[in-house]
């Protein structure tokens, strides 16, 4: 009985961490919770952008949602674009979880983003080239400013 529980725990941890190796975000436009299509993931309106990928089934994603929202507010005030992509699930749970991030949350019910783990934080430049990719949530960062510094933002 312990072996199946251990295996389930290992698989759950693997699903909530990890990273991909693509050097650019895809040139796709995902719908937003508010209705219109969002900007291309491969483009960035500012010098750097932060893209956060989360999933409704990920307990870590739920736990750190308030931190992500605070980080996005901080980055907005600093003039840095950010976006949250909610995916890796059916559209109902995606929309419900996306509501916590606001009407500009991007919905990926088609699996356009191929994240191996969530949450995932991707910093890109204006052209969409990946500068930094972090799987999981950084430990020890207790404020939006510390999180921004961890991701080399602003």
What is each stretch, according to the model?
Residues 17-19:
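Bacterial signal peptide processing site
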Residues 27-49:
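A short beta-strand-turn-helix
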Residues 50-51, 121:
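Hydrophobic beta-strand anchors of alpha/beta hydrolase catalytic cores
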Residues 79-93, 102-108:
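Thiol-based oxidoreductase modules, predominantly thioredoxin-like and allied folds used
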Residues 95-127:
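Short, internal strand/loop/helix patches
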Residues 129-154:
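Thiol-/selenol-based redox modules, centered on thioredoxin-like
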